[in-house]
Amino acid sequence: MTTLTLNTSLLSSCRILAAFSGGLDSTVLLHQLVLWRERHPDVTLRAIHIHHGLSPHADSWVRHCETVCERWQVPLVVERVTLADNGLGIEAHAREARYRAFAQTLLPGEVLATAQHLDDQCETFLLALKRGSGPAGLSAMGERSPFAGTLLLRPLLRETRKTLEQWAVRHGLCWIEDESNQDDAYDRNFLRLRALPLLQQRWPHFPAAVARSATLCAEQERLLDELLASDLTDCITAEGTLRLSPLMSMSDVRRAAILRRWLAMRNAPMPSRDALERIWQEVALARDDASPCLRFGDREIRRYQSQLWWIKSVAGQHETTVAWPVWQTPLALPAGLGTVQLVPGGELRRPREEESVSIRFKAPGVLHIVGRNGGRKLKKIWQEQGIPPWRRDTTPLLFYGETLIAAAGVFVTREGAAEDKEGVSLVWHA
């Protein structure tokens, strides 16, 4: 193996963040990138090590990575993550936390490089096959993928684990061995330790053949993207919701493909066939007077005004009152609803000295809003303004004392209208 086996065509960026666990694969990747940097002095290289806290050896692994990076003059970032039981399983949760840390560490203009190789690609394909995935899932990993507003690169994806080990031995590299890699209770370890050696003994080029199949699946998926682009444009609104009327006349297969692509655009996890069927039957085709909702982890799919919405699950806040004693500073809202602030210049009057300021999520009685004749209850205003039901008890309502002044981004009451040019605006950062 020479430095040329690193897929340098991917390395157009001069700023690289390498994921570095200290294991064999990432050690070879970092070594290759250090050699690449020697040949290209304009390259800026950093490494990141994730301390999961799962192994009693985790602290010693950090010290090992620090030693390696100091020797190779690579700045190292160590991120400690906390893993809580979220129902995903420890493998999936650790991966989620790891990539979240990567995203938070990346600097502007920097790309992430990870050390997946051909055997990893084979394992990923087989795991997707076990789950009954279609072409999208069987595409496995690409050498270049969008990630956190930049790119995730896998420059070693064409190399086998055996080739990486030969390189490491030839160059006297030291690496750590994670004891959990020998536990075949984990699906990926089972494939690596038991299934793949047997398959490769029978068919030595099995991983390469699987990688070709993954590439063909990826090509088919890209072709579908091209063929369905026009349909997708017709179905998706400016808000990112999915219009149902065009889907009604589509075949089941075409409609499912559109649903998958819409969910992918919303960064949703890839749905199973059963999940797609439930979305269509239980949400899209629910009776007209229903407010259907299907939960997916901390997200929901809802229907409103003949459109499907992919939204974050938020508990209703209609009984919540948040005091705002210093209204000149931003106020944090509960339930992850963001912040609100009153900024100079706007159509709201400032609170009088004797008026307390608060944020609430319900308002009783008949309300009179600017630009409308007569009074109406809040429920009627929500309906007239086209506010979806799930936003009606999570939209901040500004009160001065017991008087409703405004609903963030929706309306201003007559009692809240500015009386002079010294008004303010209610800004909601959701």
From Swiss-Prot:
Cross-referenced Pfam families: ATP_bind_3, TilS, TilS_C
Compartments where located: Cytoplasm
A single Gene Ontology CC term: cytoplasm
Protein's UniProt keywords contain Iron-sulfur: no
Key words of the record: ATP-binding, Cytoplasm, Ligase, Nucleotide-binding, tRNA processing
GO molecular function, one term: ATP binding
SUPFAM superfamilies: Adenine nucleotide alpha hydrolases-like, MesJ substrate recognition domain-like, PheT/TilS domain
Main localization (coarse): cytoplasm
GO BP terms: tRNA modification
Top-rank taxon, per record: Bacteria
Record-listed E.C. numbers: 6.3.4.19
Family matches, as InterPro entries: Lysidine-tRNA-synth_C, Rossmann-like_a/b/a_fold, TilS/TtcA_N, tRNA_Ile_lys_synt, tRNA_Ile_lys_synt_N, tRNA_Ile_lys_synt_subst-bd
Enzyme class: ligase
Record field: catalytic activity: cytidine(34) in tRNA(Ile2) + L-lysine + ATP = lysidine(34) in tRNA(Ile2) + AMP + diphosphate + H(+)
SMART domains per UniProt: TilS_C (SM00977)
UniProt comment concerning the protein's domains: The N-terminal region contains the highly conserved SGGXDS motif, predicted to be a P-loop motif involved in ATP binding.
NCBIfam families assigned to the protein according to its UniProt record, in alphabetical order: lysidine_TilS_C (TIGR02433), lysidine_TilS_N (TIGR02432), PRK10660.1 (NF007942)
Family of this protein: Belongs to the tRNA(Ile)-lysidine synthase family.
Stated role: Ligates lysine onto the cytidine present at position 34 of the AUA codon-specific tRNA(Ile) that contains the anticodon CAU, in an ATP-dependent manner. Cytidine is converted to lysidine, thus changing the amino acid specificity of the tRNA from methionine to isoleucine.
Descriptive protein name: tRNA(Ile)-lysidine synthase
Organism of provenance: Salmonella newport (strain SL254)
Taxonomic path: Bacteria, Pseudomonadati, Pseudomonadota, Gammaproteobacteria, Enterobacterales
